[in-house]
Amino acid sequence: MAEIKPFYCVRPAAESASRVAALPYDVYNREEAKREVEKEPLSFLSIDRAETWFPDDVDTYDERVYVKAGEVLKEMEEKGIFVAEEVPCYYLYELTMNGHTQTGITACSSVDDYLNQIVKKHENTREDKEVDRIRHCLLY
C-alpha cells in the first residue's frame, strides 16, 4: 500500500480562487496565455506561463522567466492572493466532465512507491516538459 502524507501548501485565498483559476499551462500557446493574463492579471497563468511578462523575443525557457514566476508568486502571497497553510493538509478535489465525476486526493507520496509503481503515473510525459516544470518549481 502506498504511504502518503499531508503537506504544506501555498494555495489561492478563497476570495481570490475564481480569479486565479486557469486551465493547464500546456493548453495555451504563448499568445493565448498572454491574452488570458491581460484579461485577468491574477490568473495562475501569470506564474505558470511567466513568459507572458516578457517581449516575444525572450525564450520561454530563459532563466529570467523562471525567476519572474517565483517573484510573481511571492508578490501574490504578500498581497494575500495566495496563502500558505500553517499545518500540513490533504486536499480532496472533484472533477466533472461530460456527466462523469472523479474524486481525487492530493498528498505527498514516497519516491520509492512511485519508482516501484505502487503510485501510478497518470500520463506519459516528455523529459523536456518535466525539466521545465522542475525548473519552474525550484525558484519559489
Show where each model-derived region lies.
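A cross-family signal for N-terminal binding/gating loops and helix N-caps
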Residues: M1-L139
